[in-house]
Curated annotation (Swiss-Prot):
Keywords: Acetylation, Chaperone, Endoplasmic reticulum, Membrane, Transmembrane, Transmembrane helix. Component of the multi-pass translocon (MPT) complex that mediates insertion of multi-pass membrane proteins into the lipid bilayer of membranes. The MPT complex takes over after the SEC61 complex: following membrane insertion of the first few transmembrane segments of proteins by the SEC61 complex, the MPT complex occludes the lateral gate of the SEC61 complex to promote insertion of subsequent transmembrane regions. The modification N-acetylserine is found at S2. It is a multi-pass membrane protein. It holds the Pfam family ASTER. GO terms for biological process: multi-pass transmembrane protein insertion into ER membrane; protein insertion into ER membrane. The keyword Manganese does not apply. It comes from Bos taurus. Belongs to the Asterix family. The chain crosses the membrane at residues 33-51, 53-70, 75-95. Residues 1-29 are annotated as: Disordered. This is PAT complex subunit Asterix.
Length: 106
């Protein structure tokens, strides 16, 4: 084992730990996808609630899932959870008002 340590070219005192650059220095790392999907989810859920369109309510649930999946863990989740609950309530209310299966929009 000591023969391996002698032939090892690495120097432990020269090892530097990687530190990612702060996001305010590089705005390209800030992905706007969760924010856009959150906004789309709220718009579609309001359309699903007000216009009683079931497909809008389901698209709102889909957008909320995408927003939650693409968000960073350090972000505040209150807005995402309110968007998710709004989309779920749009689906529930649209099926409570008209329990028949969804008809295709085309």
């Amino acid at each position: 084992m000591s023969a391996n340590n002698m032939s090892d070219p690495r120097r432990p005192n020269k090892v530097l730990r990687y530190k990612p650059p702060p996001s305010e220095c590089n705005p390209a790392l800030d992905d706007p996808t969760p924010d856009y999907m959150n906004l789309l989810g709220m718009i579609f859920s309001m359309c699903g609630l007000m216009l009683k369109l079931k497909w809008c309510a389901w698209v709102a649930v889909y957008c909320s899932f995408i927003s939650f999946a693409n968000s960073r863990s350090s972000e505040d989740t209150k807005q995402m959870m309110s968007s998710f609950m709004l989309s779920i309530s749009a689906v529930v209310m649209s099926y409570l008002q008209n329990p028949q299966p969804m008809t295709p929009p085309w």
